[in-house]
Amino acid sequence: MRILISNDDGVTAPGIAALHAALADYAECAVIAPDQDKSGASSSLTLDRPLHPQTLANGFISLNGTPTDCVHLGLNGLLPQAPDMVVSGINLGANLGDDVLYSGTVAAALEGRFLGGTSLAFSLLSRQPDNLPTAAYIARRLVEAQSRLALPPRTVLNVNIPNLPLEHIRGIQLTRLGHRARAAAPTKVVNPRGKEGYWIAVAGDAEDGGPGTDFHAVMQGYVSITPLQLDRTFNDAFEQLDGWLEGLL
């Protein structure tokens, strides 16, 4: 098996090193990741300049682009052989609920949908790497198990791991996405030359975080697995929209 590993924290981030180490003796692993932190890049592609891959001393490939750029190139000729699976992470920080709309970690896994199989995105609920061994162990177990599972084509598994030692993890729960409250207003700043700017505020707290959601699972000490798909069609709105459209043109 050949696995393409990427992330949005950057090619030198501890999470991607831990993920590679966990999978290296299970599959033939290639790492293509951004040359800097690209958190919040979502599924953006770089279209205004050429992309220049550079192979680092450890064999990882650094790219001056987004997580989606990395996987796109990995699936389209940058690697000697196409991968069988895309695995993204391990992100330092949660990707829960609405986070998946902005997350470069999840976007890298979504780009892997073109392989037709299942991709996985892993996130640890901490900005610190102390419990990366827990997350890496769980990632290895899930990648191994997923290879024996027949899911619908183009499924992405979004995995969030509590910031706990392995012995304190209570198990795994299958969850739906919760929802966050609206984020605080951007923070206005003025530099020493008087030029105004803004910092985007941190994500809002869980607004829909009850039982069954990814928020609830991780807060109770469980690993959360949420199956995602690209199709965002709101089918329940079709009936009302059909009536609304009548006679417009």
Curated annotation (Swiss-Prot):
EC code: 3.1.3.5
Provide any one GO MF term from the record.
exopolyphosphatase activity
Protein location? Cytoplasm
Enzyme kind, highest EC tier: hydrolase
The entry marks the following residues as binding a divalent metal cation, namely 8-9, 39, 91
Q: List UniProt keywords, sorted A-Z.
A: Cytoplasm, Hydrolase, Metal-binding, Nucleotide-binding
InterPro entries per the UniProt record, alphabetical: SurE, SurE-like_Pase/nucleotidase, SurE-like_sf
State its cofactor. a divalent metal cation
Recorded catalytic reaction(s): these are: a ribonucleoside 5'-phosphate + H2O = a ribonucleoside + phosphate
Q: How is the cofactor bound?
A: Binds 1 divalent metal cation per subunit.
Q: Does the keyword Coiled coil apply?
A: no
Q: List the record's Gene Ontology CC terms alphabetically.
A: cytoplasm
- A Pfam family recorded for this sequence: SurE
Q: What does this protein do?
A: Nucleotidase that shows phosphatase activity on nucleoside 5'-monophosphates.
In terms of PANTHER family, this protein maps to: 5'-NUCLEOTIDASE SURE, 5'_3'-NUCLEOTIDASE SURE
Q: Which family does it belong to?
A: Belongs to the SurE nucleotidase family.
The record's listing under HAMAP family reads: SurE (MF_00060)
- The protein depicted here goes by the name 5'-nucleotidase SurE
- Gene name per UniProt: surE
